[in-house]
Amino acid sequence: EIKKIEEEYAKTETPVVSNNSAHRWTPDVPMVVPELNPEHLEVIADQKKRLGTTRGFIVVKPNCSIQSYTPALHALKKAGYEPKTVVATTYQAISGAGKTFKDWPEMEHNIIPFIGGEEEKSEQEPLRIWGHVENGQIVKAEGPVITTQCIRVPVQDGHTAAVFMTFEEGKKPSKEEIIRVWREFSGMPQELGLPNAPKHFIQYLEEDNRPQVSLDVNYENGFGVSLGRLREDTVFDYKFVGLSHNTVRGAAGGAVLIAELLKAKGYITAK
């Protein structure tokens, strides 16, 4: 069992940064996007007590599917604009399944409207990122209510999301304010100048036909998030499109950035 394997590594006094989902809901294991919830790292002290370690611990990454829209929602929350309801449809690249077109030829000219387990992760994991620390554990947030559909599309790299959001009554920001919040948002990796931290975490593109995978997936070397097409909606308050690199920001690269943050904050030290 992966949970057990990761704990065994940690018990050898080895810090573990994992892309696997096994420990994402273990109460004293932080699930971190470095710009969004670095404060969750404080539960590591309690986790070490449970594991009986001095240097070893586990930190995990959230699912790649949520990286294209959770930063956009988080920036608004931090600015005092709480989304109440969110609908997101993700269009996910085949590399997210560890595949290429060579070994998954049936994906050419095809769309598959189901990815096992992704919708549950996409709806629940943002709530854990927005949770709070209580008695050495992370307690997930109550809202917003998120519903998702996750679709596999014939693209090698890059997860796109079409997102609809409604705010609390009387707390709907203007379009200009939302774009300002997105463009100005930064987090601890930017403050600390971590080696792989994007200079500008979020870019907003004004063109109607952006973001595009072929043009924007490698924004900030794949560590940034590209947003566009923000406009008012007839059912919800606003809709927009997000794009992130699923294997850089969403997987291995994001894990490296977490390791850089852990070192900068003194959690990873020389033996």
Short names for language-model regions:
Residues 52-55, 67-190:
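Active-site-lining helix/loop region of Rossmann-like oxidoreductase modules
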Residues 60-61, 127-139, 197-201, 211-216:
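N-terminal start-of-chain detector that recognizes signal peptides
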Residues 148-152, 157-271:
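C-terminal active-site/capping subdomain that shapes the small-molecule cofactor and substrate pocket
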Residues 1, 5-7, 11-13, 129, ...:
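Proteins with a high burden of low-complexity, intrinsically disordered sequence enriched in S/T/G/P/A and R
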Residues 1-107, 111, 145, 225-226, ...:
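N-terminal Rossmann-like NAD(P) cofactor-binding subdomain of oxidoreductases
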Residues 62, 112-117, 245-248:
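Hydrophobic alpha-helical scaffolding
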Residues 43-49, 122, 199-205:
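Generic hydrophobic, helix-prone segments enriched in Leu/Val/Ile
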